[in-house]
Structure formats: C-alpha cells, structure tokens
Curated annotation (Swiss-Prot):
Keywords: Antiviral protein. It comes from Coprinus comatus (Shaggy mane). This is Antiviral protein CAP. Has antiviral activity against tobacco mosaic virus and antitumor activity. InterPro entries: Y3-like_dom. The keyword Membrane does not apply. It comes from the Eukaryota. Pfam families: GBD_Y3. Disulfide bonds: none annotated. GO terms for biological process: regulation of defense response to virus. The keyword Plastid does not apply.
Length: 101
C-alpha cells in the first residue's frame, strides 16, 4: 500500500546520505527506496531564490520527515520553521523505482 509508515524506515538513510551535499538555490536532491512492490520518494529542496550554495541540516531533515510521517499517513513535506531554506518531503507511491523508457 501507499502508507508512509512503510517509508519511515528510510528517513535516517536519506537524511544521512543527501543532506551533506551542497545545494544551489532552487536545487534539490531526490532518492527512491523500494519496499514491498511500492516506492518511497524523498526530496530535499533548497527554497532560496538566490545566494550561495548551502548544505541542509541532517537533524532538521530527520525531524521534519519524522513529523510528516507521523502526521500525514499518505506522505507530506515541510520545513523546520517557516524561514528555513530547506524543504523536506516524504512521498509513498505505487510502482517501483525504475524508469521505464
């Protein structure tokens, strides 16, 4: 099913792997995890419109995604606070992580 609970187990790996990267303004990082014939899409997005490239906070990533997973059974997104530059998202979906051409 597309329940976010099946995706929550990947939060630490996603945040530990993608937040150390440097993101230009309006740039993002994504990762897909396969689970039980479905997929879990995760995103980190630098919402700044200008400025220097920056790194996301690993603890903020984990806090936001855990909060979304606990409050939103079909997935969600958010920031640690309204002025924070990074948006984090967790999105369970049907299908697998492969791309069909």
């Amino acid at each position: 099913n597309r329940d976010v609970a099946a995706c929550a187990r990947f939060i630490d790996d996603f945040c530990d792997t993608l937040t150390p990267n440097i993101y230009r303004p309006r740039d993002n990082g994504q990762r897909c995890y396969a689970v039980n014939g479905h997929r879990c899409d995760f995103t980190v997005f630098n919402t700044n419109n200008g400025g220097n490239p920056i790194r996301a906070s690993t603890p903020n990533c984990k806090t936001v995604l855990r909060t979304a997973a606990n409050r939103c059974p079909t997935g969600g997104r958010g920031k640690i606070n309204p002025n924070a530059p990074f948006l984090f998202a967790i999105d369970p979906n049907d299908g697998d992580c492969s791309t069909n051409f």
